[in-house]
């Protein structure tokens, strides 16, 4: 039976000094016999998805202590991708994921904590904490801050989100007054942005991985029901500790819950709900931390057989996360997938012995439990606020229409092919990814002329200056993990293409990545990246490129001899951008770039290189 890790610093005569310091934090004699639960919070006033988390750590802490544990809270950083977008701040977003993972590891290992409650929400925070949890492999539960309510305005017939504000701002025909109205209405409350963007996608995936409670990805940040998730997380983590440390049950450890089959479940959910392409990057990174052989080949295999059962902004304007919740949340999507024979349901979760048990209890089409139905009726109040649990509005009815509703059955899927796809070809030998959920079917096969830009900044200038025409394939390169460095998101270029009326007439290919708010024929994560000798660095203005989503291919239409000749020439020149890029690459960013792998590896650190440098 494993000992509490915390005994290292709480037991024995030689630890008198450590105990003296623990006592200074408020611990008493009886506390040294209890598990120490680390509460990894991510409160910050910089990020709307985290602005309401200040008191959440202590809310969980009180419940941990009632359940028989000792709670110790600490904070990690959180970067807002939307605020960092469109300038050098975006260079820091993806690297922050590694910093977050490391900071959780540092705090938990330095203080010998026995378990973790991860209070996350936005884009890099959930992935960073997930990486740390799988690295540490001690009992863990995730509870996120929850999604923002969709914005409302009389100027639009649909709910608004951040992307609407960006698109209208780039529309030269829109008045300043209309832009201001959208700006003031798009993000009305605390919480992660209201569509199926990266933050909400990742919080939904923690449910599928088995590491979070039902409702974690969909219950609104403002709704009073969400408080129960935090309280239940506090009780559950102490129970998980008891099972592992007192009953020798290692099935509750994160690597045994989030195993290979669970990663397949998470990716299956992601494809079915048309999640952000960033989720692929983060799942690949988390799998490496768990030492699981899960890669783009597995994702490609799943993408060919999983239908799209849910369509949410930015893929469709009609639905936001509040609508997903009303339709039964993630466990209702999982229920439909299970009935289609597309899930592994025999896996443990933090709340049920098996996923099948969890689905039976929480899928609104399977259960008559009035409490479950009431929970999923929780809806938006439409009142701007930065306060959690500030309203208790409920829909009069659930959306259980699986033929035409927000969530569909396999038989009535939005499409029989899912919302994400992996493409391979001579321009991306190790793969690239596209969110097919946001691509109009008329351009699933697209041949166009390459228009080369060697930074996001120059691409934005070119698009706004009307240098990009219908039929072009915009190539933005040297923006990968090494080349950027930091693998910037390309939300501004895609939003501006849309505002110019080119959303269905152009494509975009990059070794960078896309915001979860991106839609259109936007292909990212081209691997290897240009800075690592990837063929995207060999494309020239005017070259023809053929994109074929049904056949999962993307190719530069030149022969092998020409490709080899260009590669020899580029090897001599060096793999770096020709155009001047006035960006400041700090020591911190250089350190990230030195060790970063391409996107097909999750843009994690190159462990082989690390082992060489530090044997």
Curated annotation (Swiss-Prot):
- The organism sits in which domain of life? Bacteria
Q: Does the keyword Plastid apply?
A: no
Q: Where would you find the membrane-spanning parts of this chain?
A: none
Q: List, in alphabetical order, the Gene Ontology terms for molecular function in this entry.
A: 2 iron, 2 sulfur cluster binding; dihydroxy-acid dehydratase activity; magnesium ion binding
Residues modified as N6-carboxylysine: 124
Q: GO terms for biological process?
A: isoleucine biosynthetic process; L-valine biosynthetic process
- UniProt KW Iron-sulfur keyword: yes
- Report the cofactor remark: Binds 1 [2Fe-2S] cluster per subunit. This cluster acts as a Lewis acid cofactor.
Q: Name one Pfam family in it.
A: ILV_EDD_C
SUPFAM superfamilies, alphabetized:
IlvD/EDD N-terminal domain-like (SSF143975), LeuD/IlvD-like (SSF52016)
Broad enzyme group = lyase
Entry cofactors:
[2Fe-2S] cluster; Mg(2+)
Q: Which reaction does it catalyse?
A: (2R)-2,3-dihydroxy-3-methylbutanoate = 3-methyl-2-oxobutanoate + H2O; (2R,3R)-2,3-dihydroxy-3-methylpentanoate = (S)-3-methyl-2-oxopentanoate + H2O
Q: Which residues are noted in the entry as Mg(2+)-binding?
A: 81, 123-124, 489
Protein EC: 4.2.1.9
Keywords, in A-Z order: 2Fe-2S, Amino-acid biosynthesis, Branched-chain amino acid biosynthesis, Iron, Iron-sulfur, Lyase, Magnesium, Metal-binding
The cellular component terms of Gene Ontology attached to this UniProt record, alphabetical and capped at eight, are:
cytosol
| Active site residues of this protein | 515
Which pathway does the UniProt entry assign to this protein? Amino-acid biosynthesis; L-isoleucine biosynthesis; L-isoleucine from 2-oxobutanoate: step 3/4; Amino-acid biosynthesis; L-valine biosynthesis; L-valine from pyruvate: step 3/4
Residues engaged in binding [2Fe-2S] cluster: 122, 193
Q: Which HAMAP family match?
A: IlvD
The Swiss-Prot or TrEMBL record describes its family as follows: Belongs to the IlvD/Edd family.
Assembly mode: Homodimer.
**Function comment:** Functions in the biosynthesis of branched-chain amino acids. Catalyzes the dehydration of (2R,3R)-2,3-dihydroxy-3-methylpentanoate (2,3-dihydroxy-3-methylvalerate) into 2-oxo-3-methylpentanoate (2-oxo-3-methylvalerate) and of (2R)-2,3-dihydroxy-3-methylbutanoate (2,3-dihydroxyisovalerate) into 2-oxo-3-methylbutanoate (2-oxoisovalerate), the penultimate precursor to L-isoleucine and L-valine, respectively.
The protein, known as: Dihydroxy-acid dehydratase
Q: Which organism is it from?
A: Pseudomonas syringae pv. syringae (strain B728a)
């Amino acid at each position: 039976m494993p000992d509490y890790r915390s005994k290292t610093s709480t037991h024995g005569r030689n630890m008198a000094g450590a105990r003296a310091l623990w006592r200074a934090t408020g611990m008493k004699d009886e506390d040294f016999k209890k598990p120490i639960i680390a509460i990894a919070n991510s409160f910050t006033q910089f990020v709307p998805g985290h602005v309401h988390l200040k008191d959440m750590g202590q809310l969980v802490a009180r419940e941990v202590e009632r359940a028989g544990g000792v709670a110790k809270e600490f904070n990690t950083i959180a970067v807002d991708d939307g605020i960092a977008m469109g300038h050098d701040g975006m260079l820091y977003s993806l690297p922050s994921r590694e910093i977050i993972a490391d900071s959780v590891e540092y705090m938990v290992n330095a203080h010998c904590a026995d378990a973790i409650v991860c209070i996350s929400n936005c884009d890099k925070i959930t992935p960073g904490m997930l990486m740390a949890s799988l690295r540490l492999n001690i009992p863990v539960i995730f509870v996120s801050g929850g999604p923002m309510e969709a914005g409302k305005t009389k100027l639009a017939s649909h709910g608004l989100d951040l992307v609407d504000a960006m698109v209208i701002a780039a529309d030269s025909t829109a008045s300043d007054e209309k832009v201001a109205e959208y700006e003031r209405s798009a993000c009305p409350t605390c919480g992660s942005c209201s569509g199926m963007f990266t933050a909400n996608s990742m919080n939904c995936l923690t449910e599928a991985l088995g590491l979070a409670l039902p409702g974690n990805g969909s219950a609104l940040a403002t709704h009073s029901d969400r408080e129960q998730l935090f309280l239940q997380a506090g009780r559950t983590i102490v129970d998980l500790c008891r099972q592992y440390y007192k009953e020798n049950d290692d099935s509750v450890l994160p690597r045994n819950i989030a195993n290979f089959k669970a990663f397949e479940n998470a990716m299956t959910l992601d494809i079915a709900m048309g999640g952000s392409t960033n989720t692929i990057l983060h799942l690949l990174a988390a799998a490496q931390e768990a030492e699981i052989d899960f890669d783009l080949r597995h994702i490609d295999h799943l993408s060919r057989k999983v239908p799209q059962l849910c369509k949410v902004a930015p893929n469709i304007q009609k639905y936001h996360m509040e609508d997903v919740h009303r339709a039964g949340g993630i466990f209702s999507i999982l229920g439909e997938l299970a009935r289609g024979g597309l899930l592994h349901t025999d896996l443990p979760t933090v709340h049920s012995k098996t996923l099948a048990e969890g689905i039976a209890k929480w899928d609104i089409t399977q259960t008559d439990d009035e409490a479950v139905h009431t929970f999923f009726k929780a809806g938006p109040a439409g009142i701007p606020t930065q306060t959690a649990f500030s309203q208790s509005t409920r829909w009069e009815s659930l959306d259980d229409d699986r033929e035409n509703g927000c969530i569909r059955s396999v038989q009535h899927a939005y499409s029989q092919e899912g919302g994400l796809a992996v493409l391979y070809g001579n321009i991306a030998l190790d793969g690239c990814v596209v969110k097919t959920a946001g691509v109009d079917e008329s351009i699933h096969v697209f041949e166009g002329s390459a228009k080369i830009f060697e930074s996001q900044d120059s691409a934005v200038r070119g698009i706004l200056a009307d240098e990009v025409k219908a039929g072009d394939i915009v190539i933005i390169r040297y923006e990968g993990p090494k080349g950027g460095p930091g693998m910037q998101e390309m939300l501004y270029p895609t939003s501006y293409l849309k505002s110019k009326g080119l959303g269905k007439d152009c494509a975009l290919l990059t070794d960078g990545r896309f915001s979860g708010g991106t839609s259109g024929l936007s292909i990212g994560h081209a691997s290897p990246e240009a800075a690592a000798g990837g063929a995207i660095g060999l494309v020239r203005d005017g070259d023809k490129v053929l994109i074929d989503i049904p056949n999962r291919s993307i190719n530069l239409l030149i022969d092998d001899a020409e490709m080899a000749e260009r590669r020899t020439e580029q090897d001599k020149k060096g793999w770096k951008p020709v155009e001047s890029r006035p960006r400041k690459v700090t020591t911190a960013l250089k350190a990230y770039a030195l060790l970063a792998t391409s996107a097909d590896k999750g843009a994690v650190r190159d462990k082989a290189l690390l082992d060489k440098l530090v044997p």
